[in-house]
Amino acid sequence: MQMKKVVLLGDSIRLIGYGKHVAEFLGRDYDVWQPSENSRFASFMLRQVFDHRDRIAGADAVHFNAGLWDLCDLFGDGPFTPKEEYVATLLRTVSVLKQQGAGTLIFATTTPAGPGKKDHSIERTAEYNRAAVEALKREGVIINDLFGLVSTDIGAYIRPDDMLHLTATAEIVCAKQTADIIAASITAAAGKRTPGSLK
């Protein structure tokens, strides 16, 4: 059986978090690739889509997340990226990924910060997630709700030292959910193809 090609894009929640374990959960039938750099803002991730276009071309699934950098309000005068611009950039990213021949597209919602992390308020995170999910669903993007998953036990899933990144336990839990969604989505997409269109 031909290996399924999977690409992971995203910020540090991916890079030093769930992304470290997805390949293990998916197993030997999947070829998982991800950049070794942080995707940071949604706009930087869009740039990565260009830089890594050869890796992305023909991928059976591209799983992506961005938002922590965008919604951050360090100075008290508003987030780095306005919500409307954030959503527009995600939509542009989806459009480019489709042009590059990527198959199933999966967006992971932005994870919540710990209590007292004012520059990453849970309310603003939820607001950005709602806007992104509403827009991306219309484009056929599958949603991996990491916000909902991590919100079930922030104390266990968000590191107390920085109130932002995933604990070791959360890395595994998020990776398992991510791998399950990727595998199920690729299987479902394959079932929709006619015999003559199979890769």
Q: Which sequence ranges carry the predicted segments?
A:
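Conserved SGNH/GDSL esterase-like catalytic core that processes O-acyl groups on lipids
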Residues: 2-92, 165
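Glycine-rich phosphate-binding loop signature in dinucleotide/nucleotide-binding domains
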Residues: 54-58, 100-101, 185
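Basic/polar N-terminal segments that are highly enriched at the extreme N-terminus
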Residues: 1-3, 198-199
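Short, structured coil segments at secondary-structure junctions
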Residues: 26-28, 101, 139
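Alpha-helical scaffolding segments of alpha/beta enzyme cores, especially the outer helices
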Residues: 85-88, 92-96, 127-134
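Conserved beta-strand segments of alpha/beta enzyme cores
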Residues: 31-33, 104, 140-142
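Catalytic His-Asp segment of secreted/periplasmic serine-dependent ester chemistry enzymes
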Residues: 110-199
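Active-site segments of SGNH/GDSL-like serine hydrolases
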Residues: 65-71, 95-127
